[in-house]
């Protein structure tokens, strides 16, 4: 069994910092726009709800074969948080697959932040013992599809819960 731990990932403009409970207050503001839930459903979390969620997330998966990896996206020049990226790494077909996702606050969208963060995450995961990346994207979410494509993922014919499965095979490490 391979367990992977989140480490800081540095890109040209961003620091992807391993998630800490202390990020909840600032992230609640970043993620406060209800429009962020247009494709996923739900509503923005309060700081207290987000703190509780982050406590669960940083506690790790109850399944020792699964690694929960979560980062906040920090804009280095502005020294502020702008979103999150995550990877759930689990055994699949004799190897490890990372299910990845990203979200960038409305105020920071349209600046290539999600693309840069997803590319940084994909590059880092490619240095881990992960054989494949997977993302599930709503078919109408064109911006998220563009991020997935920029991170090297391609859409498949598979669907899950109304979303298209995107995949990228990695060179085994």
Language-model regions, residue ranges each:
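Conserved active-site alpha-helix within GNAT-family acetyltransferase domains
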Residues: 115, 140-156
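Conserved G/P- and acidic residue-centered "switch" motifs that form tight phosphate/ATP-binding loops
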Residues: 79, 112, 141
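GNAT-family acyltransferases
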Residues: 1-107, 120, 124, 128, ...
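Generic recognition of short, well-ordered alpha-helical segments
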Residues: 31, 99, 113-116, 146
């Amino acid at each position: 069994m391979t367990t992977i731990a989140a480490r800081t990932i540095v890109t040209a403009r961003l620091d992807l910092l391993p998630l800490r409970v202390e990020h909840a207050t600032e992230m609640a503001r970043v993620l406060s726009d209800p429009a962020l839930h247009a494709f996923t459903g739900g509503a923005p979390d309060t700081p207290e709800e987000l703190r509780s969620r982050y406590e669960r997330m940083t506690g790790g998966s109850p399944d020792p074969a699964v690694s929960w990896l979560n980062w906040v996206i920090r804009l280095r020049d502005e020294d502020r948080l702008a979103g999150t990226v995550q990877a759930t790494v689990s055994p699949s077909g004799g190897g490890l697959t990372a299910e990845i996702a990203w979200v960038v606050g409305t105020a920071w969208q349209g600046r290539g932040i999600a693309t840069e963060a997803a590319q940084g995450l994909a590059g880092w995961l490619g240095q881990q013992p992960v054989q494949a990346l997977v993302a599930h994207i709503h078919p109408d979410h064109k911006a998220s599809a563009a991020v997935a494509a920029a991170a090297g993922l391609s859409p498949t014919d598979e669907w899950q819960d109304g979303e298209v499965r995107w995949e990228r095979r990695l060179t085994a490490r």
